[in-house]
């Protein structure tokens, strides 16, 4: 009887410890701070990638990076999974308007509170650059086709 109680308690502890991890993410997606992330090795324009993300999971968009900790998580995830693909990865931020100002919102509607530019240029979409280990934001022509990260 004592062994049964010990085993039951052990299973309960394991279940409770897993309930706050990736259990809520779809299969193949990675979990971080209550959000789910997936890298797609498909080469799409920024707009195509955003549309693709929206079709994957309810509430999904191109990734919005809102802290240095999240930037580190995304960089590690991309580095581990993009060893032989392109040099840029789309993120959910683009420049809008006649003055080419950076939008104050990510494609998911959240405010831009963290920035990590490598340099500012006249190109209107943003991605992570391989040369910076996918940690810095780089301006890229929106019609270029690149892999991307979706976040839900």
UniProtKB/Swiss-Prot annotation:
Keywords: Blood coagulation cascade inhibiting toxin, Calcium, Disulfide bond, Hemostasis impairing toxin, Metal-binding, Secreted, Signal, Toxin. This is Snaclec coagulation factor IX/factor X-binding protein subunit A. Belongs to the snaclec family. Residues 1-23 form the signal peptide. The keyword Metal-binding applies. Calcium is required for ligand binding. The lineage of its organism: Eukaryota, Metazoa, Chordata, Craniata, Vertebrata. Its main location: secreted. It comes from Gloydius halys (Chinese water mocassin).
